[in-house]
């Protein structure tokens, strides 16, 4: 599968007199239809990276290729039309008096025909389960509902790429999981490419690959399973240790023969049943 995004030795500084660059020779790619999670401590360069991809910032050196085109000042708006951004606080994105108006806003700015706008808005709201809230004021929605509307606004633009900048961090665990599953379903149905900046284990677990950033550089890329198998190192990377990994580690320390590495709760349940049946 070909890369839809590629960064080659990208360097960026916010200030000329910085002792260390914000990004220092960052190189990685994102495949078409892939879900890539980007993790790392605050200040590691995560948000700077996605702002460079969206053309909100300009690299000092290196190159960024999006959907086969080198990102430049002359084509930045064309590139942005291929990318939908969803931020941590959806209130900062709302501009419409109603949910319907807000989702339609970007489409109206593109000069799309009224009937097409109506069809796209209805379809996008249906995808995120918010079709019954069309006439509601965004300010009266819950945090999870607001994020669903923000995602609908992005999806209605028919982008090839969705970027989530800690989009689930302000939600409760239940709302967070529901939103992640909604995004996954949309990604699977429409072959969207998803990049998510996150500290949430459920979000990381659903991704295809995980990119770890540290001090403005790429520390590693791996599958979620490979990342979770790093055990106590996860704390240093800004993640908690998954519950199932902690259970496996404790069982191994007690001498029980159980497979090492990350297991889902269902996989752990199966392993425990097999272990008990042999006792």
From Swiss-Prot:
Location of the ABC transporter domain: 5-240
PROSITE patterns for the chain: ABC_TRANSPORTER_1, ABC_TRANSPORTER_2, CBIO
EC class: translocase
Record-listed ATP binding positions: 40-47
Gene Ontology MF: a single term: ATPase-coupled transmembrane transporter activity
A GO cellular-component term linked to this record: ATP-binding cassette (ABC) transporter complex
Key word Transmembrane helix present: no
Annotated Pfam families: ABC_tran
SUPFAM superfamilies named among the record's database cross-references: P-loop containing nucleoside triphosphate hydrolases
Membrane topology listed for this record: Peripheral membrane protein
InterPro entries in the record: AAA+_ATPase, ABC_transporter-like_ATP-bd, ABC_transporter-like_CS, ABC_transpr_CbiO/EcfA_su, ECF_ABC_transporter_ATP-bd, EcfA_1, P-loop_NTPase
Subunit (UniProt): Forms a stable energy-coupling factor (ECF) transporter complex composed of 2 membrane-embedded substrate-binding proteins (S component), 2 ATP-binding proteins (A component) and 2 transmembrane proteins (T component).
Function: ATP-binding (A) component of a common energy-coupling factor (ECF) ABC-transporter complex. Unlike classic ABC transporters this ECF transporter provides the energy necessary to transport a number of different substrates.
Name of this chain's protein: Energy-coupling factor transporter ATP-binding protein EcfA1
Organism: Streptococcus pyogenes serotype M5 (strain Manfredo)
UniProt gene name: ecfA1
């Amino acid at each position: 599968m070909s890369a839809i995004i590629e960064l080659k030795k990208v360097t960026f500084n916010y200030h000329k007199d910085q002792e260390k660059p914000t990004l220092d020779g960052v190189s990685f790619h994102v495949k078409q239809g892939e879900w890539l999670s980007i993790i790392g401590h605050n200040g590691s360069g995560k948000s700077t990276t996605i702002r460079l991809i969206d053309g909100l910032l300009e690299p000092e050196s290196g190159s960024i290729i999006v959907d086969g085109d080198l990102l430049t000042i002359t084509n930045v708006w064309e590139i942005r039309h291929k990318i939908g951004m969803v931020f941590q606080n959806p209130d900062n994105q709302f501009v419409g008096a109603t949910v319907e108006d807000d989702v339609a806003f970007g489409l109206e700015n593109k000069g799309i025909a009224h009937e097409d706008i109506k069809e796209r808005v209805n379809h996008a709201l249906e995808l995120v389960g918010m079709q019954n809230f069309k006439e509601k004021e965004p300010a009266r929605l819950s945090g999870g509902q607001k994020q669903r509307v923000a995602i609908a606004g992005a999806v209605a633009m028919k982008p090839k790429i969705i970027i989530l900048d800690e989009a689930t961090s302000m939600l409760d665990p239940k709302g967070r999981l529901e939103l992640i599953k909604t995004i996954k379903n949309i990604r699977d149905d429409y072959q969207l490419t998803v990049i998510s900046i996150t500290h949430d284990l459920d979000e990381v677990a659903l991704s295809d690959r995980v990119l770890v950033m540290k001090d403005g550089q790429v520390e590693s890329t791996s599958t979620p399973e490979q990342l979770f198998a790093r055990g106590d190192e996860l704390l240093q990377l800004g993640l908690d240790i998954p519950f199932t990994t902690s259970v496996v580690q404790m069982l191994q320390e007690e001498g029980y023969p159980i497979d090492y590495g990350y297991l889902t709760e269902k996989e752990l349940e199966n392993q425990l049943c097999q272990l008990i049946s042999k006792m």
